[in-house]
A protein has these predicted regions:
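Active-site acidic/histidine proton-transfer and metal-coordination neighborhood
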Residues: 1-58, 168-175, 183
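A residue-identity detector for tryptophan
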Residues: 15-17, 65, 109
């Protein structure tokens, strides 16, 4: 419940963090009869709780692209969540991991940290990932990057038991290359 989150956050914020910002990452919430991965609070409840704490504490929220897509079962829900956080001036970070609506290895609408989709400039990718370069660009275009504390990636190479170190490193390196290209870094 939102009350439980508030109590937990109040306890956590009572500890000495030496000025550090405490950030929560939104996870999918239970929606109607749709199977959920985490089934936590709605983003509205999380934002409301953080706003209540914001006057006295340095707090924020991170939006994970895949987790928001899982919640909405679509690629527009991450943008909706980001816009809500921006409107409330509480967005602290963006995390990019992919998701699929039809992948055998990573599952359908599963929080398995699926890599980015195919891009002409990368060697390592997942064909069925909904996280395309276009979706990343659309996401970054609505955010003033100077106003967020960080961008990140969460990726997993599957199958776990036969993934090589080259593939694991390559997936992360290629993801950073895609982000750098979108952001204009060379």
């Amino acid at each position: 419940s939102a009350d439980s989150l508030l109590k937990s956050m109040e306890e956590i914020l009572s500890w000495d963090w030496e000025g550090s910002k405490i950030v929560i990452e939104h996870c999918d919430t239970a929606v109607d009869n749709i199977p959920f991965e985490k089934g936590f609070l709605t983003i509205e409840d999380e934002i409301k709780t953080l706003i209540e704490l914001q006057g006295m504490h340095n707090v924020g929220i991170t939006i994970n692209w895949a987790r928001s897509a899982i919640e909405g079962r679509n690629i527009t829900k991450p943008l909706e969540h980001i816009e809500l956080a921006l409107k409330s001036n509480i967005l602290s970070g963006l995390m990019f991991s992919g998701v699929s609506d039809n992948d055998i290895q990573y599952g359908s609408w599963k929080d398995t940290h699926m890599p980015f989709s195919k891009n002409e400039n990368v060697q390592f990718f997942e064909e069925n990932s909904l996280l395309t370069q276009e979706e990343i660009s659309n996401t970054l275009n609505i955010v003033d990057l100077d106003s967020v504390d960080y961008l990140g990636v969460k990726l997993l190479s599957m199958p776990i038991d036969s993934s090589t170190i080259d593939r694991r490193v390559g997936l992360n390196s290629d993801a950073v290359s895609i982000l750098n290209k979108i952001l204009g870094f060379r």
